[in-house]
């Protein structure tokens, strides 16, 4: 981390550490952990760190990351595994849900230890989050919200983020050629997500088999 860049970090009091996979998941994750560790121990950075875990990374590296990051995330990206395989045959949901499990166990074990020992190390005290890509594959809003609801049933999952698919690859026919990201749909999903998290709505109270997608012209709470 360059000193000038670190100065900018201090001004913002928070940062997001992320990377595409280089060589393999563990190699990439090890480098992310090293940056987070240096920020804490060498540069004495006490601000907020959100570290995006790499799917397929080892439990040991995820556990180490949680000692330096306030929040960890592993992105689901595509809700249905068959659609994930269609776009990225080398990926599967196991590589995503395994690190999620490691994070959950680390957070819960840390809380238990800190109840017994005041100075026990914290582990990702802000919990974990994930992201779903909207519009790249055939999932309905109902499919996406059922996944979100299941994830919120896990005690350490704090947020599911929704990101409208942006078409940047026109030659790959597996991907839809959208003229613009589905921003209205993305916004409706966030509104429905709010109902799930804060008002304890059930998914089938928002969408159902007859109407599996949120109405673009009306907010979910009014539909």
Language-model-detected regions and their locations in the chain:
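Short, flexible active-site-proximal loops enriched in glycine and acidic residues
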Residues: 11-16
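Conserved AdoMet/S-adenosylmethionine-binding subsite of the radical SAM
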Residues: 23-207
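Conserved alpha/beta core segments of nucleic-acid transaction machinery
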Residues: 209-223
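Single conserved hydrophobic/aromatic residue that forms the stacking wall/gate
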Residues: 1-10
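Auxiliary alpha/beta "docking" domains used to position bulky ligands
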Residues: 20
